């Protein structure tokens, strides 16, 4: 059995390497047929805020489409060309702010609604994707981009401590911590109030704001429980170095799931059946997707069929099955990746259940809304303001902000 597992992993790694080389434009085109005498229609692909290694194939559909990639680097020059009417056929971009790249916001009139492409397609449908993903990425009922891979941000606890993980609130975790001698801390020292609040800001943008109606609703028990959860961390600042507590002595562990293989090793790592509890909402718990490379079709694209063919190629089960820098966004490919990773049936079930608990998505931040939430919480965290007063302040400031920005 050991050698069978090793050989399966070698084969998977080899296939993954082939796909990576193809994605970099260094291998043979997506189709292995000889090029036709006529050059296919050109698809101009702009790569913005993304490294060259993410470049995709150089031709598609037996050379029906010839792909030309342009590396824009920073987004300012690209936006200037776009607004001047010089749009590419497709844009590849980093959907999540990362390092020096701020991320590109495509939720505007310059880009097509990709639901129209999905709904008209004969092989790809909304149900092809991971549960809740498209809804989480949508704004005002429109889907302006798709992503190639995702991570899932969540919290994990042991079943012996939390049962099935349903219906938990911050007060429940405090009670479990007090009743169980094994656990010395709710979090390890790397999980600070501010790092938790960053995640709450991501959740809040989807859960408590309505851009279409320029409104928000932070005055609810769900948002209060999230702020309580942040304040339950005893750590105000991140301390570089090793955690004060052993892995076995912390009740909740933060996980950023970016590989199906992680589901294989988790039972051994936790020494008990792991439970994906997410962020507390008094129900199933909530987790969120972190979007990686994004694809968007400009409204002024001159080759929209070719642009959609490019996206479909990158989202095919064959290409998705061996995504190495995250989790596949196509459900069938995700399930196959679990099988390829020798994940147990029980953990496969838990992984699929986690998808149902993953309700939101991080893409491009609303920096103004985040600033309102983080600034308003400082007095609550240092003990000079009550939770109710803090929520009132956030609701008041955010209401004005939403009206001004989206009204």
Map each language-model feature to its residues.
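Loop/turn elements at helix/coil->beta-strand transitions in domains of secreted/extracellular proteins
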Residues: 40-43, 63, 86-89, 142, ...
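Extended ligand-binding regions for polar small-molecule ligands
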Residues: 298-321, 388
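Hinge/lid segment of periplasmic solute-binding proteins
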Residues: 98-154, 275-278
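Helix-loop-helix "hinge/cap" segment bordering the ligand-binding cleft or interdomain interface
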Residues: 118-119, 135-240, 299-305, 386-389
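Short helices/loops that flank or line small-molecule/ion binding pockets
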Residues: 75-87, 91, 95, 99-105, ...
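Extracytoplasmic/periplasmic substrate-binding proteins
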Residues: 228-303, 309
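Long, aromatic- and glycine/proline-rich binding clefts that accommodate carbohydrate-like moieties
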Residues: 324-379
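Conserved N-terminal structural module of periplasmic/extracytoplasmic solute-binding proteins
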Residues: 2, 10-13, 18, 24-100, ...
């Amino acid at each position: 059995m050991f050698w069978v597992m090793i050989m399966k992993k070698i084969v998977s790694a080899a296939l993954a390497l082939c796909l990576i080389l193809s994605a970099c434009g260094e291998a043979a085109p997506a189709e292995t047929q000889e090029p036709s005498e006529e050059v296919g229609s050109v698809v101009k692909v702009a790569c913005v805020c993304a490294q060259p290694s993410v470049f995709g194939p150089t031709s598609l559909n037996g050379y029906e489409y010839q792909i030309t990639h342009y590396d824009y680097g920073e987004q300012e020059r690209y936006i200037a060309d776009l607004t001047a009417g010089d749009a590419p056929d497709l844009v590849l971009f980093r959907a999540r702010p990362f390092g020096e790249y701020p991320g590109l916001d495509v939720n505007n009139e310059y880009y097509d609604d990709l639901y129209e492409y999905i709904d008209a397609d004969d092989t790809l449908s909304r149900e092809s994707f991971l549960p809740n993903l498209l809804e989480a990425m949508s704004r005002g009922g429109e889907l302006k981009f798709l992503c190639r891979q995702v991570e899932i941000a969540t919290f994990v606890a042991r079943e012996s401590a939390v049962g099935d993980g349903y219906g938990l609130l911050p007060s429940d975790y405090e009670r479990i911590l007090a009743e169980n001698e094994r656990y010395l801390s709710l979090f390890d020292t790397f999980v600070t109030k501010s790092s938790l609040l960053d995640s709450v800001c991501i959740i809040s943008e989807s859960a408590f704001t309505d851009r279409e109606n320029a409104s928000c609703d932070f005055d609810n028990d769900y948002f209060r429980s999230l702020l309580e959860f942040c304040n339950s961390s005893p750590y105000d600042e991140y301390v570089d170095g090793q955690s004060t507590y052993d892995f076995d002595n912390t009740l909740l562990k933060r996980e950023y799931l970016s590989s199906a293989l992680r589901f294989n090793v988790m039972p051994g790592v936790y020494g008990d059946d792991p439970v994906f509890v997410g962020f507390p909402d008094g129900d199933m718990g909530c987790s969120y997707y972190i979007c990686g490379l994004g694809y968007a079709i400009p409204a002024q694209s001159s080759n929209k069929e070719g642009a959609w063919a490019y996206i479909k190629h990158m989202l095919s089960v064959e290409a998705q099955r061996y995504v190495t820098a995250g989790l596949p966004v196509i459900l069938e490919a995700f399930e196959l990746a679990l099988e390829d990773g020798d994940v147990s049936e029980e953990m496969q079930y838990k992984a699929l259940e986690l998808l149902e608990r993953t309700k939101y998505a991080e893409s491009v931040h609303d920096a103004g809304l985040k600033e309102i939430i983080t600034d308003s919480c400082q007095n609550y965290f240092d003990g000079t303001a009550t939770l109710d007063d803090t929520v009132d302040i956030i609701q008041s400031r955010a209401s004005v902000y939403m009206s001004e920005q989206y009204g």
